[in-house]
Amino acid sequence: MSCQQSQQQCQPPPKCTPKCPPKCPTPKCPPKCPPKCPPVSSCCSVSSGGCCGSSSGGSCGSSSGGCCSSGGGGCCLSHHRHHRSHRHRPQSSDCCSQPSGGSSCCGGGSGQHSGGCC
């Protein structure tokens, strides 16, 4: 019995699995930046859907960020009319008609065609 015990002691130790390298501290994620907006002249107020521009589609509504492309980056008003009395101009009632040279910002107060532009 003493021989068997001595043989077990003389056996090389089992190979250890290699230790993983120490994990580097993960850098803290930077705060999420808002999507890059076009110039201020083609941005809506936050309440009316954010940014407008040629890249945001050409229709009013939540699917296009509340923006429309009429007038070169015009913005939709924050409120949407439920009744569609003007069938020949379905989007102009909710969009600014100011040309692209203006600031084309919309406010939620006025319901006129271009009264919501500043």
UniProtKB/Swiss-Prot annotation:
Q: In which tissues is it expressed?
A: Skin-specific. Expression was readily detected in adult trunk skin, adult arm skin, fetal skin, penal skin, vulva, esophagus and tongue. Not expressed in the cervix, rectum, lung, colon, or placenta.
For biological process, the GO terms are: keratinization
Record keyword Transmembrane helix present: no
Q: What else is known?
A: Belongs to the LCE cluster present on 1q21.
User: Which Pfam families does the annotation name?
Assistant: LCE (PF14672)
Query: Where are the compositionally biased (Gly residues) regions?
Result: 104-118
Where does this protein have compositionally biased stretches of type Pro residues? 11-23
Could you tell me what induces this protein? Answer: By UVB.
Bias (Low complexity): 1-10, 92-103
Subunit structure, interactors included = Interacts with CYSRT1.
Task: Tell me the function of this protein.
Answer: Precursors of the cornified envelope of the stratum corneum.
This one is known as Late cornified envelope protein 1E
Keyword Cytoplasm in annotation? no
Task: State the residue spans of region: Disordered.
Answer: 1-23, 84-118
Which keywords are on file for this protein? Keratinization
What family is reported? Belongs to the LCE family.
Q: Which gene encodes it?
A: LCE1E
Name the Gene Ontology molecular function terms of this record: identical protein binding
